[in-house]
Amino acid sequence: MQDIRRDKFSGRIMGIDFGSKRIGISISDPTLTIAQGLFVLENNSKVFEEIKEICSQYNVGLIVIGLPVKLSGKHSNKTNEVVKFINELKSKLKIEVISWDERLTTKLAQKSKIEMNLKKKKRQDKNLNDVIASSLILQSYLDYLKNKETMVARNED
């Protein structure tokens, strides 16, 4: 997983949960405190252009993409597919793109749908799962940034 200093980018952060069919998209608030799920994009030939438009619309300065790793920390079969997508995204956009550990986000997304008391039909909505997963990935990164800033501030005192 990569890290990037807050002073290396400006604007909001976009979260992406990559899938071979669907891509969940989330966005941070302007203060980089809260992740909000937006929607799902179809993973097709237009996806890079659509991501570029969303970045422009929301003033995105950094993209965080969930990197699938096993609980042991080893790469999964899907990891290479995500890395290829990250490299292609970097080549098409002039925005910093980093990977972030997405372990258990799909399970947490499913659990959160149950906790929201959604009806069974709505809980089975795969698009909702992808949006929630992208929000969880992004929120994890935002929390990391906040904790890192707190630690730096304490060390400066």
Where are these regions (language model features)?
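Phosphate- and other anionic-substrate recognition elements at nucleic-acid/protein interfaces
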Residues: 1-14, 20-21, 26-157
